[in-house]
């Protein structure tokens, strides 16, 4: 019940992210060790971001790095990007709780490489139409098309 009262859910790539999507809450998800193409939120209200670090996605639940590099995938998450998307999502959906929002449209997505080398989540079969940008820098397509 608590998630359905949220106007925006900023979370990590975890179980609560999927619960938020299931409750139709706009979800802004920060990806650390997990690959975005395997675990990204799957409706039109979701945005996924990752830090531009060379070890992403390591798929390791216990970071093997030490010192300043420990958990760099989360520590180097660009705060300005998170705030930008949070502001954008609040502007799109208003400050109404999820239970007051209309049910999101269902669509299948794919990870599509753009001419500039960045990647986006786009609906399958929608030539050239971008749904949500994904922070560039090393996301590799995983055969989702």
Model region roles, listed by residue range:
Residues 21-143:
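Nucleotide-sugar donor-binding patch of glycosyltransferase catalytic domains
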Residues 1, 144-145:
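Accessible peptide chain termini
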Residues 1-32:
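Donor-binding and catalytic core of enzymes assembling or modifying cell-surface/extracellular glycoconjugates
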């Amino acid at each position: 019940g608590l998630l359905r009262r949220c106007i925006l859910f900023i979370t990590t790539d975890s179980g609560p992210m999927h619960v938020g999507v299931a409750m139709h809450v706009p979800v802004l998800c920060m990806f650390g060790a997990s690959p975005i193409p395997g675990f990204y939120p799957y409706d039109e209200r979701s945005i996924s971001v990752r830090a531009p670090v060379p070890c992403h996605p390591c798929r390791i639940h216990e970071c093997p790095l030490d010192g300043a590099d420990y958990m760099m995938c989360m520590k180097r998450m660009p705060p300005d990007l998170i705030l930008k998307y949070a502001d954008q999502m609040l502007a799109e959906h208003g400050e109404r709780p999820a239970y007051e929002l209309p049910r999101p449209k269902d669509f299948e997505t794919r990870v599509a490489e753009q001419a500039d080398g960045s990647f986006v989540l786009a609906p399958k079969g929608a030539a050239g139409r971008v749904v949500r940008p994904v922070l560039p820098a090393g996301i590799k397509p995983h055969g989702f098309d």
